[in-house]
Design a protein with these regions (language model features):
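RNA-contacting regions in translation and RNA-metabolism proteins
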Residues: 1-69, 82-104
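Glycine-centered tight-turn and secondary-structure capping sites
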Residues: 73-77
């Protein structure tokens, strides 16, 4: 069993996809962002995605280990831009505005 198989089994237990269908846009976006961040980095235990709301917009802050920041951001910010687009799409289903930032 590979590391990814073990992680997939653990992640499947933590978030039931059926629960996401009824979740609010912000919760769905947070779950999707957490999943994507964990798939991109080596130190999955260091990933923590926190949400805060201000003026009708939810900001998701991704905390990662310093050695994984480059993987999470990508060249010219392309990876984090893709994560932002997916998170925004997940939130848009319920009309929620989502912003994704990376903690340094």
């Amino acid at each position: 069993m590979s590391v990814h198989d073990e992680f997939d089994a653990e992640y499947d237990e933590a978030i039931d996809p059926d629960d996401l269908d009824d979740a609010a846009g912000a919760a769905r976006a947070q779950a999707v962002t957490d999943f994507l961040a964990r798939e991109l980095v080596e130190d999955v235990d260091a990933i923590d995605v926190t949400a805060s709301e201000s003026r009708g917009e939810v900001t998701l802050l991704i905390h990662a280990s310093p050695q994984d920041l480059g993987r999470l951001i990508g060249r010219r910010g392309r990876v984090i831009q893709a994560v932002r687009q997916v998170a925004r799409a997940a939130g848009a289903a319920d009309g929620q505005r989502i912003n994704v930032e990376v903690a340094e």
